[in-house]
């Protein structure tokens, strides 16, 4: 059992921020739920490790299935309840499953070169297996299909499909899209009713990558050693919230400065642009959830690279040292990502700082 430590079942808990003193006023933020209980989980694992050819070839295979019941959620509530109508409740059941594979090779070659290379690949999937009727509206995009029926993973997002940019007034008039504009985003009419409504939404975002992978390489030769670690994910959706600032003028902070991507926005002399035309208002609601913000977040990163040298014993004996090693190390040195990804770091598509690149020099001594 786990999870209840993250939420409260009462309506009276007080949370103090900043100064740590009681504020001069209070407001209701949620309703009590005396029936709230802990989430429960059951997990099954199976795996094996192996070594072959006197330890030169080694690896492992692992698999797991994990079922979580009575998940804690904060479902939508009736607007008539007003402020403080939210309430934590036990809701969906979720099944997670996945596998991990690792394969390595180590060898000391006749030339004096030692190597140890390990590659790993893993994937996991999840599926909502139960969703109470009271929660269906929080996890559905039509009146008939919810997360259970769709087979989509937990955390999937619904939204509108962007077909492109309106090139002229004739396209706007024929679309039936409310408040459409020339140079604005054109949404797909999925239900074929000649207009854009909530029923034209579909599943647009999958939070689970196809697989993750890594590669460790360690080499040594006559006192020198070199190690590196590569890590990546493949076929992962990223919901790029930075586009609110980089691709639009009026969705948020209309009075603030913007990025240089706006210089390439659509206009009558730049009709091939995929960035909507600039506007001082957002009457077309172009910040709504849509495929415009979903990008390919696949990447490969050089997480760590280190070069070292162990001083010879003949030198160390003069100073009564047992070991001495100097090294140069770097972290987050290289990122290979999709050309279609517009944010700088696929791991930080929001407004967090990207992972910093760092380089360090070190000396290790033993006596």
Positions of PLM-derived features:
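Extracellular/periplasmic, surface-exposed regions of secreted and cell-surface proteins
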Residues: 1-152, 285, 289-367
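Conserved small-residue
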Residues: 3, 89-92, 106-207, 238, ...
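Membrane-proximal, glycine/serine-rich, low-complexity loop/turn segments characteristic
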Residues: 3-16, 135-139, 169-170, 218, ...
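Outer-membrane beta-barrel transmembrane strand signature
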Residues: 21-53, 58, 148-229, 274-304, ...
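C-terminal region/CTD detector
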Residues: 213, 227, 236-238, 317-319, ...
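Extracytoplasmic gating/loop element in the C-terminal half of outer-membrane beta-barrel translocons
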Residues: 233-325
